[in-house]
Amino acid sequence: MIHKSLSELQEEIDTYINGFEEGYFPPMELLARLTEELGELSREVQHVHGMKKKKPGEAVRSLEEETGDLFFVLVCFANSQGISLEKALTTVVEKFKVRDANRWTKKEEL
């Protein structure tokens, strides 16, 4: 399996999307699609971990597939807005490390 950085994935998706005349959807359309994909992931989580089981004949989808769909649209949104996901995620991880440094009970080191 080939492992790619967030930057490489963003570049690959950008090349793919820009291969079409239409290019990226407008921001509000991408936001609506993010919401749609999050709803589909939520439904699968309910089927796997919740009380709501699939109806007979309902399509089987995996949490991995639905997470991938959501992430693809998120990358499209980030690309369309010129956002580096590596930079954004690095910044937020550092924010959480500082903000929540003493918020949770730490596991004892072995």
Residue locations for each model-derived region?
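Flexible "arm" and connector segments at domain edges
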Residues: 1-67, 71-110
